[in-house]
Design a protein with these regions (language model features):
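Short, flexible/disordered intra-domain loops and linkers
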Residues: 48-60, 98-102, 169-177
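Surface-exposed alpha-helical segments enriched in charged/polar residues
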Residues: 66-70, 145-149, 153, 211
Protein backbone atom coordinates (compact mmCIF):
# COMPACT_ATOMS: atom_id res chain seq x y z
CA UNK A 1 0.00 0.00 0.00
CA UNK A 2 1.43 3.40 -0.96
CA UNK A 3 1.97 6.09 1.61
CA UNK A 4 -0.72 8.73 1.90
CA UNK A 5 -0.13 11.71 -0.36
CA UNK A 6 -0.74 15.24 0.86
CA UNK A 7 -3.30 15.74 -1.90
CA UNK A 8 -5.27 12.73 -0.62
CA UNK A 9 -5.26 14.15 2.89
CA UNK A 10 -6.27 17.63 1.77
CA UNK A 11 -9.35 16.31 0.00
CA UNK A 12 -10.64 15.12 3.38
CA UNK A 13 -10.07 18.38 5.25
CA UNK A 14 -13.22 20.45 5.64
CA UNK A 15 -13.61 24.06 6.87
CA UNK A 16 -14.64 24.53 10.50
CA UNK A 17 -15.70 27.62 12.43
CA UNK A 18 -14.68 28.32 16.04
CA UNK A 19 -17.29 28.42 18.78
CA UNK A 20 -17.45 31.61 20.88
CA UNK A 21 -16.02 31.14 24.36
CA UNK A 22 -18.62 33.33 26.06
CA UNK A 23 -15.85 35.09 27.97
CA UNK A 24 -14.92 38.76 27.92
CA UNK A 25 -11.25 39.55 27.22
CA UNK A 26 -9.56 41.28 30.12
CA UNK A 27 -6.13 42.13 31.41
CA UNK A 28 -3.16 43.44 29.46
CA UNK A 29 0.24 42.10 28.53
CA UNK A 30 3.28 43.75 30.02
CA UNK A 31 5.59 45.07 27.33
CA UNK A 32 7.85 44.02 25.86
CA UNK A 33 6.43 40.66 24.77
CA UNK A 34 9.47 38.68 23.66
CA UNK A 35 8.00 35.20 23.25
CA UNK A 36 4.64 33.55 22.61
CA UNK A 37 4.16 29.82 23.17
CA UNK A 38 0.99 28.41 21.61
CA UNK A 39 -1.06 25.28 22.15
CA UNK A 40 -2.21 23.55 18.95
CA UNK A 41 -5.71 22.15 19.38
CA UNK A 42 -8.19 24.86 20.24
CA UNK A 43 -5.57 27.60 19.83
CA UNK A 44 -3.80 27.43 16.47
CA UNK A 45 -6.29 24.96 15.02
CA UNK A 46 -10.00 24.46 15.61
CA UNK A 47 -10.60 20.95 16.92
CA UNK A 48 -14.00 19.37 16.32
CA UNK A 49 -13.70 16.60 18.90
CA UNK A 50 -12.42 18.63 21.83
CA UNK A 51 -11.21 15.80 24.07
CA UNK A 52 -10.93 12.02 24.17
CA UNK A 53 -14.43 11.47 25.61
CA UNK A 54 -15.96 13.64 22.89
CA UNK A 55 -13.92 11.74 20.33
CA UNK A 56 -15.31 8.44 21.64
CA UNK A 57 -18.87 9.67 21.22
CA UNK A 58 -18.13 11.14 17.81
CA UNK A 59 -16.60 7.93 16.48
CA UNK A 60 -19.10 5.48 17.91
CA UNK A 61 -21.57 5.86 15.06
CA UNK A 62 -19.26 6.85 12.24
CA UNK A 63 -19.14 4.82 9.06
CA UNK A 64 -15.76 6.34 8.22
CA UNK A 65 -13.94 3.96 10.52
CA UNK A 66 -15.67 0.94 8.96
CA UNK A 67 -14.47 2.12 5.54
CA UNK A 68 -10.96 2.66 6.90
CA UNK A 69 -10.85 -0.83 8.37
CA UNK A 70 -11.90 -2.38 5.06
CA UNK A 71 -9.30 -0.32 3.21
CA UNK A 72 -6.56 -1.75 5.42
CA UNK A 73 -8.04 -5.28 5.26
CA UNK A 74 -8.79 -5.40 8.98
CA UNK A 75 -11.70 -7.79 9.48
CA UNK A 76 -13.07 -6.29 12.67
CA UNK A 77 -15.93 -3.98 13.54
CA UNK A 78 -15.46 -0.31 14.34
CA UNK A 79 -16.91 -0.89 17.81
CA UNK A 80 -14.37 -3.61 18.61
CA UNK A 81 -11.46 -1.54 17.35
CA UNK A 82 -12.53 1.53 19.31
CA UNK A 83 -12.93 -0.49 22.48
CA UNK A 84 -9.47 -1.99 22.03
CA UNK A 85 -7.97 1.41 21.17
CA UNK A 86 -9.15 3.12 24.34
CA UNK A 87 -8.32 0.06 26.44
CA UNK A 88 -4.78 0.02 25.00
CA UNK A 89 -4.29 3.72 25.70
CA UNK A 90 -5.53 3.32 29.27
CA UNK A 91 -3.30 0.26 29.80
CA UNK A 92 -0.26 2.11 28.46
CA UNK A 93 -1.00 5.06 30.73
CA UNK A 94 -1.38 2.78 33.75
CA UNK A 95 1.87 0.93 33.02
CA UNK A 96 3.83 4.16 32.64
CA UNK A 97 2.32 5.67 35.78
CA UNK A 98 3.63 2.68 37.74
CA UNK A 99 7.15 3.81 36.80
CA UNK A 100 6.49 7.19 38.38
CA UNK A 101 5.31 9.23 35.40
CA UNK A 102 2.22 11.11 36.54
CA UNK A 103 1.05 12.40 33.14
CA UNK A 104 2.26 9.99 30.42
CA UNK A 105 1.87 10.33 26.67
CA UNK A 106 1.49 7.24 24.48
CA UNK A 107 3.17 6.33 21.21
CA UNK A 108 0.01 6.21 19.10
CA UNK A 109 1.74 4.33 16.27
CA UNK A 110 2.72 1.52 18.62
CA UNK A 111 -0.82 1.52 20.02
CA UNK A 112 -2.34 1.21 16.55
CA UNK A 113 0.04 -1.59 15.58
CA UNK A 114 -1.05 -3.54 18.64
CA UNK A 115 -4.76 -2.88 18.06
CA UNK A 116 -4.89 -3.49 14.31
CA UNK A 117 -2.11 -6.02 13.81
CA UNK A 118 -0.68 -3.99 10.93
CA UNK A 119 2.72 -5.41 10.08
CA UNK A 120 4.75 -2.24 9.68
CA UNK A 121 5.14 1.07 11.44
CA UNK A 122 4.60 2.97 8.17
CA UNK A 123 1.22 1.30 7.60
CA UNK A 124 0.23 2.00 11.20
CA UNK A 125 1.20 5.67 10.71
CA UNK A 126 -1.02 5.90 7.64
CA UNK A 127 -3.88 4.33 9.57
CA UNK A 128 -3.32 6.73 12.47
CA UNK A 129 -3.44 9.76 10.17
CA UNK A 130 -6.65 8.63 8.49
CA UNK A 131 -8.27 7.82 11.82
CA UNK A 132 -7.30 11.21 13.21
CA UNK A 133 -8.90 12.99 10.25
CA UNK A 134 -12.13 11.08 10.89
CA UNK A 135 -12.11 11.30 14.70
CA UNK A 136 -10.74 14.80 15.19
CA UNK A 137 -11.35 17.11 12.22
CA UNK A 138 -9.30 20.28 12.45
CA UNK A 139 -8.99 23.57 10.60
CA UNK A 140 -6.83 26.66 11.12
CA UNK A 141 -8.15 29.36 13.41
CA UNK A 142 -9.29 32.52 11.59
CA UNK A 143 -6.43 34.88 10.71
CA UNK A 144 -3.76 32.42 11.87
CA UNK A 145 -1.28 33.26 9.06
CA UNK A 146 -1.73 36.98 9.76
CA UNK A 147 -1.00 36.52 13.46
CA UNK A 148 2.10 34.43 12.81
CA UNK A 149 3.40 36.89 10.21
CA UNK A 150 2.89 39.79 12.63
CA UNK A 151 4.83 38.05 15.40
CA UNK A 152 7.66 37.19 13.01
CA UNK A 153 7.87 40.82 11.87
CA UNK A 154 8.02 41.93 15.53
CA UNK A 155 10.84 39.44 16.23
CA UNK A 156 8.76 37.63 18.83
CA UNK A 157 10.13 34.16 19.56
CA UNK A 158 7.35 31.70 18.76
CA UNK A 159 7.00 28.20 20.09
CA UNK A 160 4.49 25.43 20.77
CA UNK A 161 3.68 23.39 23.88
CA UNK A 162 1.04 20.82 23.02
CA UNK A 163 -0.31 17.38 23.76
CA UNK A 164 0.37 15.93 20.36
CA UNK A 165 1.26 12.93 18.24
CA UNK A 166 3.52 12.62 15.20
CA UNK A 167 0.79 13.91 12.89
CA UNK A 168 0.28 17.16 14.82
CA UNK A 169 3.25 19.02 13.27
CA UNK A 170 2.06 17.80 9.85
CA UNK A 171 -1.02 20.04 10.12
CA UNK A 172 1.09 23.03 9.13
CA UNK A 173 2.22 21.32 5.94
CA UNK A 174 -1.28 20.12 5.07
CA UNK A 175 -2.79 23.59 5.38
CA UNK A 176 0.11 25.95 4.67
CA UNK A 177 2.68 23.92 2.70
CA UNK A 178 5.25 24.64 5.39
CA UNK A 179 6.72 23.06 8.47
CA UNK A 180 6.31 24.97 11.75
CA UNK A 181 9.84 26.33 11.38
CA UNK A 182 8.97 27.70 7.96
CA UNK A 183 6.15 29.73 9.52
CA UNK A 184 8.43 31.32 12.10
CA UNK A 185 8.37 28.87 15.00
CA UNK A 186 11.76 28.32 16.58
CA UNK A 187 12.90 24.68 16.36
CA UNK A 188 14.18 24.77 19.94
CA UNK A 189 10.79 25.99 21.18
CA UNK A 190 8.70 23.11 19.81
CA UNK A 191 7.55 20.90 22.67
CA UNK A 192 5.24 18.14 21.46
CA UNK A 193 4.23 15.65 24.14
CA UNK A 194 4.88 12.54 22.04
CA UNK A 195 8.57 13.47 21.84
CA UNK A 196 8.83 13.53 25.64
CA UNK A 197 6.53 10.70 26.63
CA UNK A 198 4.89 13.26 28.91
CA UNK A 199 1.59 15.10 28.48
CA UNK A 200 0.27 18.34 29.90
CA UNK A 201 -0.30 19.22 32.67
CA UNK A 202 3.07 17.60 33.37
CA UNK A 203 5.57 20.35 34.22
CA UNK A 204 8.22 18.64 32.07
CA UNK A 205 7.23 20.42 28.85
CA UNK A 206 6.94 23.81 30.55
CA UNK A 207 10.23 23.40 32.41
CA UNK A 208 11.94 22.47 29.15
CA UNK A 209 10.55 25.60 27.50
CA UNK A 210 11.59 27.80 30.42
CA UNK A 211 15.10 26.36 30.29
CA UNK A 212 15.48 27.17 26.58
CA UNK A 213 14.09 30.67 27.04
CA UNK A 214 16.47 31.33 29.92
CA UNK A 215 19.45 29.99 28.00
CA UNK A 216 18.70 32.23 25.02
CA UNK A 217 18.04 35.32 27.10
CA UNK A 218 14.35 35.66 26.31
Amino acid sequence: MRMLAKADIRRRLQPLAPLPTGLTPRGALRAPVRSVLFDVYGTLFISASGDIDAARNRMSGRSGLEILLRKHHIARSATEVLQDLYAAVEAAHAATKKSGVQHPEVDIVRIWQAVTGLDSRSRAKDFAVEFEIIANPVYPMPHLPVVLKYLVEKNVAMGIISNAQFYTPLLFDWFFDAEPEGLGFRPDLLFFSYRFGRAKPSPVLFESAARVLNQTGV
